[in-house]
């Protein structure tokens, strides 16, 4: 299986609807603030994430199941990294640009 052998910082832009869904999904979980049931499509490069109002900066520990898609699709410019489904995220802080999150677990 594909895992990262180093810590990563990944970026994800989401619309308000998706962000609210992620919060709703995590509502009954005591250990996380955001929960994504599907795969989490992110960018390895800051400002290459999808340009939505809500932007997540996700700290991903080494050993996380994820795959770099930038060399297998025709969208190299996104530097896409897909994180395994069932991602649990903890919000650490917020700044004027990003909601800073730590990835806790995946499936």
Regions found by a protein language model. Give the residues of each.
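Mono-ADP-ribosyltransferase
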Residues: 1-107
